[in-house]
Amino acid sequence: KTSNEAALKNESYLTTLEEIKQKHFETITNLVAKKNQNDLLVTITNEIKQLKTLLDGCFLIGELSPRTSDAIVSFGELLSSQIIAVALQEKVSDAIFKDSRELLKTNSNFGKATINLKLTNSLISNYFNSFKQSVVLLPGFIASDEKGNTTTLGRGGSDFTAAILANGCKATSLEIWTDVSGMFTANPKLVKQAKPIESISYHEAMELSHFGAKVLY
């Protein structure tokens, strides 16, 4: 919404941006201990400034390119994950935040980039092999191309990120938490008669993934 407002030369994007900023500040106030708020507020403020620079550019030229769009929408994941990371550190002292763009590498198909699995797996493996913290928090949905430009993985990109990371570090299990309890015979939001599937084979799951089933990658 905000980027489209800016590209249409609608100055209301500034109001929307301020609302976004205040919403994140309120989240910090409610979620993070007071002693840890100042540094985080500075971090989030700096991120918002970078976002504003991109939006100002869209406003000036009256255009929103796919590359700029990816850069803009990435802030949603970046802002929220950094807030969650600080809140998590209050419970797990050695938990850290890691920018997924440093590990997930893609082509330059902005909006729905394709992962370079060989390079990505190598980067993930090297990182986690030298990783000593008990918990690492990475934002989903975002990656970067060979030039360092921010890319996004398209619809379902956050779940896909989890699957890529699990594969790269050879995890023994991957849990994806959603607002639906397990897999259903249909989308329960659309089909009231949908029923949960008690068990499913890997082959059946693979077939479903080919037909666009969410969560499966």
Residues covered by each model-derived region:
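Nucleotide/pyrophosphate-binding catalytic subdomain
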Residues: K1-Y217
